[in-house]
Amino acid sequence: MERLEIHSEYQRELLLSGLKHFFGDFNDKLLGRVLPRLEWLGAASGEIIFRQGEPGRDLYFVVSGRLRASVDDGLGGERVLGEILRGESVGEMSVVTGAPRMATITAVRSSVLVRFSRRQFQILLNEFPRISLRLMHLLIERLSRSGSIQSNRRRPENIVLLPISAGLDAEVLATQLGERLARFGRVRILTPGLAATLFGAAAMHSTREQTAEYLAMTRQLDELEGQHDFLLFVANREDCGWTRRCLNHADEVLLLASADEPPAPAPFETALATQDDGMSRAGRRLVLFHEAACLSPSATSAWLNARELIGHVHLRRNHAPDLDRLARIVSGNAVGLVMSGGGARGFAHLGVYRALVEAGIPIDYVGGTSMGAVIASLVALDIPPRAAIDSFREVFRVRPLSDFNAFPLVSLISGKRLEKLLGTAYARLIGESRDVEDCWKNFYCIASSYSYAREVVIHRGPLLKMLRASLSIPGFFPPVFHAGEALVDGAIFNNFPTDEMARIGVGRMIGVDLGDDNFGPVVGDEFPGAWALLRHWLLRWLPGRRDGLRVPLLGGMLFRAPMLYSKSRQKRSAEVVDLLIKPDLRAIGMLDWSALEQIVEIGYRHTRDQLQADKEPGFSPAARRLP
């Protein structure tokens, strides 16, 4: 990092705001002691501020820019914990406790920092002991958050639009996107022409060696950033000074591409992504444009394999809802929908989906487990609710679990019939088979690795195969072999995968929990004999006749037993959603495939009534602000 001898009055005001947040009440005497002890520093994009495991000698205040915290994942890579924004501090935990650094901190883009040494900080604490109370409060708050599921929601302030395909007008998209971002804050668009007018052509193309011009423009950009919630930089489709300047200030880069163009990166894109000055540290999101009549994207994997990305978005040209979705995603206001497993009860998700669409609630990300994954994929494919319901009504006239194995060495059911039913349904809706990453809306599902006893979060791969893996109940269906692993039902580890949606970082989350209640207590201390079991089973079919026994039968045991661990974490999973939808399906069995109409209607009516109610259990205040 380089020392900065000159800083603007605006940057000084930003620092004072951060100091007040950190120290609490701030008087002139305390300010007079602090300011002379501070060191102003400039960090380039990609520069490491400190590394995990190093001794904690200093703490830092972010005056402008953005930092990223990450830890070693134990597999040779890194796991991102979050980002430190303007006005926030980093490093205080190690400075106070003397413990090694808990994470590696890297500058996402060009940043201005202020450093406060541990020695100077301790002198200040001795002189103003009341600071300790404020600091203790901040540390306790941070530690309390570390033990719970946290949303990785991030709101980029500087967004760069970089066209990588010829023929795309980035300025038009910036205007369209800016109009939609204005719903969430103040927006300023910086095109090459406007930048030349504001800063001068020489400053636009200045490099770090041209210190005066470079820093002057940096300060001007900092002030613009402070006056707006979003800066949209329109970069050139070439490796030039303006494009590099845009990338140096980027919190996120949108790579704009035409889906009908070759997916291989152009030379200028490769040069910008691999340069040594760290401009590639900002997250890059691929935005693929499709023709308006496109039924479903295809071959997305070729684009993703060629780039290191934080995500991708499919857009249909001149399709306003897709542009609305992009604006919600990049502004941190995306809406996520999570659907739990539940066997035949999963048809209720179709009714929930219909009610959400009728209420005008948009869905930007969707995920699920087992049967929830199947319905979630229909949402992700942008299949209208009525079309999805009609297709499943037709297909599931055939019982999906009736193809028993003559020699059940691996499973009771071969699974071929269910595979054929799903294939028929999806062929009617979208034509040929697709991959997970080809869905219009970003989709994930959960499977369990029988090979390595771990949860598998699936964001890519053949769609139907991945759905089969997510609902392959051990003992009922054979495992699905994929990438060297035997995959089985995701409900074993995570039947209600809200934690993955939180990791994605949506602004609002809707969760649909179809998990049944606990089995409950049994009567007596001995398991009943054969005659008592037979009598119990026969009485179940006679109206009004019960014998008082509570016995788990084979079908229920095979369904429920593998999900006991997942069920133990279901309550915690429900705590992170903004809107919890939990239809009453106790009268429906998990194998009642013939009750599709009834199940769909229960899901629809429950969701419709819940959305219309003023006060409803599970309907949190945050959900009232769903876009």
PLM feature spans:
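Cytosolic regulatory regions built on CNB/CRP/Popeye-like sensor folds
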Residues: 1-171, 183
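Hydrophobic residues at beta-strand termini and immediately following loops
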Residues: 41-43, 84, 116, 190, ...
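Walker A (P-loop) phosphate-binding motif
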Residues: 152-195, 335-341
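Patatin-like phospholipase
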Residues: 205, 219, 224-229, 238-367, ...
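Gly/Ala-rich beta-loop-alpha elbow adjacent to hydrolase catalytic centers
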Residues: 368, 372
